């Protein structure tokens, strides 16, 4: 994104921030009314166009956040608001010709952003897209076997210790983890049966060797999955009223505390919350 585009984006964002003040109050009020069951410890409310650009996946390189919408990628400071860079047409024409129209969950690994790409409602091309984390430029893609990945690719996650990429066999009712090697052109490595199905995973990240998965189930729960034996344990319920649970990541704050950061679309879908949750 050029300097002119950055300045223009910031100017538009500032103007819209003023315009959307009433909506910010409204959505914040709705969230406050239902906050008795919430388990977050802090939150950022993003209203209007900004919410659209933060409506699917998220990840971090440890210093900045990355967010996806169905067709865009943006990079922000860890306040989740200040845009550093953006690609508002992040699906290349080559993939659009295959029907790809949806960017899902993201995962940062070794200078790249790995993204689940889908031809939604068709499910012929489950694709892992690779983007340069510094520039957001599209770099490469890998088409997975649609007979193995049977209902799209709403999320992917790379284990930073092994370079293995994880996903599931089904977007709604998965029965196993599927593992691919990023160092060998996404060669299939193995499958790991889950102890029970984790429904509607929207995004996942590794922390201390455990795979954490954020879902859009009834309580928008976050689960912990052992990547060795597939044992599943619920970590917490987000207990959100309506809306939609989205992606997640981890960030270490200036005080040294590591927190789980998860995103959700608000009840009336004109805002997005980026919330912090305890890791332990």
What do the PLM-derived regions correspond to, one by one?
Residues 30-52:
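A short helix->beta-strand "capping" segment at the edge of beta-propeller domains
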Residues 70, 118-120, 168-172, 216-218, ...:
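Short loop/turn segments immediately following the C-termini of beta-strands
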Residues 72-77, 122-130, 173-180, 219-225, ...:
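Structural motif
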Residues 82-118:
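Blade-loop segments of beta-propeller domains
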């Amino acid at each position: 994104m050029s300097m002119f585009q950055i300045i223009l984006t910031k100017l538009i964002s500032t103007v819209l921030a003023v315009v959307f003040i009433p909506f910010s109050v409204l959505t914040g009020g709705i969230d406050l009314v239902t906050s008795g069951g919430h388990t977050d410890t802090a939150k950022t409310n993003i209203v209007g166009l900004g919410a659209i650009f933060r409506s699917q996946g998220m990840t971090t390189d440890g210093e900045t956040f990355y967010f996806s919408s169905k067709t865009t990628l943006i990079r922000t400071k860890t306040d989740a608001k200040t845009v550093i860079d953006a690609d508002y047409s992040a699906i290349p024409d080559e993939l659009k010709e295959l029907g790809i129209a949806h960017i899902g969950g993201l995962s940062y690994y070794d200078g790249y952003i790995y993204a689940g790409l889908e031809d939604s409602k068709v499910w012929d091309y489950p694709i892992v897209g690779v983007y340069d984390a510094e520039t957001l430029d599209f770099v490469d893609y890998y088409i997975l076997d649609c007979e193995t990945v049977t209902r799209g690719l709403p999320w992917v996650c790379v284990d930073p210790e092994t370079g293995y990429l994880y996903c599931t066999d089904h977007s709604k009712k998965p029965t196993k983890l599927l593992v691919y090697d990023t160092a060998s052109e996404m060669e299939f490595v193995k499958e790991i049966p889950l102890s029970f199905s984790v429904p509607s995973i929207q995004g996942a990240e590794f922390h201390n060797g455990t795979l954490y998965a954020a879902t859009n189930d009834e309580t928008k729960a976050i689960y912990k999955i052992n990547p060795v034996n597939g044992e599943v344990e619920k970590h917490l319920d987000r207990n959100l009223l309506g809306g939609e649970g989205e992606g997640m990541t981890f960030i270490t704050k200036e005080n040294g505390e590591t927190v789980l950061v998860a995103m959700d679309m608000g009840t009336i879908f004109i805002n997005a919350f980026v919330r912090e949750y305890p890791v332990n």
